[in-house]
Amino acid sequence: MKKLNLVALPHFVSVENLKNDEVKALIKRAEYFKKGGAVARLTSPVYVTNMFFEDSSRTHTSFEMAERKLGLTVIPFDPAHSSVNKGETLYDTSLVMNALGIDLEVIRHSQNEYYEDLINLKQHQKLNIGVINAGDGSGQHPSQCMLDMMTIHEHFGHFKGLKVAIVGDITNSRVAKSDMELLTKLGAEVYFSGPECWYSEEFDQYGKHEELDKLIPKMDVMMLLRVQHERHSGDPNEKKFDAHRYHEKYGINHKRYEAMKKDAIIMHPGPINHDVELSGDLVESDKCMFVRQMENGVFMRMAMLEAVLRGRKLGGLE
């Protein structure tokens, strides 16, 4: 019997240190789950809590669905009524969760790299809990990135040589940062478009910024990003924002849709602002993978959670 190539990780907080073969193994495992493959049987209970300090519907529900499909026991956590509001640190909250018997915590937080304090412990610290990053500020969004990779691989069967345009508010997007890094590592060619005020020179190492209409006919993937209004506090460009003008200049309308390559796809991490990033009646079009991305998210998050279960030898897995 062929030995399965399964990933084992102590935490899943970033795609930065993932090896290419680990990415491919996670995609393969997620595809296995999607086809109805059996989950590994847990020999002891595993307790997980979802700590979302920023609003979320898709990611939160997707993680909980993945957890339940794996047979984990999900313990509710309400940030609005947590002791964080009394000044408790995230580390101390995690310490409490750990003491109560929680094995894993899935966290979304507004602070970039919040997880560093939870996984890089000082000599006197004893926290022993697995951390899965569901998004840190404008830093990383590893689970969205991984489900994006799964969706691209499912459609094209490979990454090498694919041309991918990331369009929109790139500076404030954690999805963009995770995706550009991993796509480049996997051999895809990355391009950027969108308002230059929301583009940073630090992205030049991954690809170049071009006018949208010049990019569209040669791209395999159009990855659209919403404008992150909630992260624009004090940004003078926010006051000048006009949804109609943005759609005219940077959105995918019917004319641009028709200019795309026959086999090209549109992706969006959601939520979609209709008639801003994408014409509303194109959300469920043949090229748009938005619904498939959400579907794939459950199975990829199952693969990611399972990798941490194995890495921490929880539930009898290793």
From Swiss-Prot:
Pfam families assigned to the protein according to its UniProt record, in alphabetical order: OTCace, OTCace_N
Top-level taxon of origin: Bacteria
Keywords (A to Z) from UniProt: Pyrimidine biosynthesis, Transferase
Single GO biological process annotation from the record: 'de novo' UMP biosynthetic process
Leader sequence residues: none
Family of this protein: Belongs to the aspartate/ornithine carbamoyltransferase superfamily. ATCase family.
Protein name: Aspartate carbamoyltransferase catalytic subunit
Source organism of the structure: Lactobacillus delbrueckii subsp. bulgaricus (strain ATCC BAA-365 / Lb-18)
Lineage: Bacteria, Bacillati, Bacillota, Bacilli, Lactobacillales
